[in-house]
Amino acid sequence: MVNILKKRAFGGAILAALLLASSAYVGAQSAPAAGAQGKTELLWFGQAGFRIKTPQGKMILIDPWITGGPKTPPMYKNDLAAIGPIDLLLVTHAHVDHLGDAPTIAKTNNTKLYGPADMVTPLTTLGVLPAELGYRFNKTGQVTPLPGIKVTAVQAEHSSLLVWKNPATDKLESHPAGEPMGYIIELENGFKIWHMGDTGLFSDMKFISEHYKPDLVLIPIGGNFTMAPDDAAYALRTWVKPKMVIPMHYNSNPMTKGTLAEFQAAMKGSNIKVIPMTEGETVQF
């Protein structure tokens, strides 16, 4: 069984509350593989940015829009070092609210940035990212970037454009950045997380779920650029059917009007555990 422990960080203070059986989110999980210790911990920075601490203590960072994020807690917004050492950096596409601080974090940590092939290429050719820190892969490509960690790139229905300030002209330039992706991340104990990235509805969500069998889904609900709450609920209830879901990509842009309350209402009566988070909060599985 999976018991979820939720924490919230504001400034330097951390409030930890243990959710007892009567109120905890509980879901089934595969038996941990031999040698896998500890729990899985997710920290949400806002938008689509998460840090995953794996059962063996590896740190995975996804879509780190930290310094520019309007809802990023100050302890991280004002000091990227507060995120801690990062072992693996994943970016779903080149839009600024996903690529964000990834190149800076990659260089600071000497950690490779894994992302869509045609996003990583302009990052390296333009000098935004050193070539040795870029790793290119594409949809359905599975990689093992760290011992015991598997990452598979999957479909996302969205767009991708790299906006870059040319230091020679001091002007912004737009560069094609390939296709966006989502990620199936399998941890040391077999626990699988599907970070959907930015996406609208597509029927192969059913295939992806049936084939990869994610335990936890991180799903956008804000609308306008991604699924709205009702679309996200339809995808989950009809096609994906995970054990647990964390809504993301809302509450950060006036154009993404979808709300947590609307999503919770659309999920009412479902057996899928909805785990709402606030920016700076962590959950443990």
UniProtKB/Swiss-Prot annotation:
The keyword Hydrolase applies. Keywords: Hydrolase. Pfam families: Lactamase_B_2. The keyword Hydrolase applies. GO terms for molecular function: hydrolase activity. Gene3D superfamilies: Ribonuclease Z/Hydroxyacylglutathione hydrolase-like (3.60.15.10). HAMAP family: UPF0173 (MF_00457). Belongs to the UPF0173 family. NCBIfam families: PRK00685.1. This is UPF0173 metal-dependent hydrolase Pnuc_1524. It comes from Polynucleobacter asymbioticus (strain DSM 18221 / CIP 109841 / QLW-P1DMWA-1).
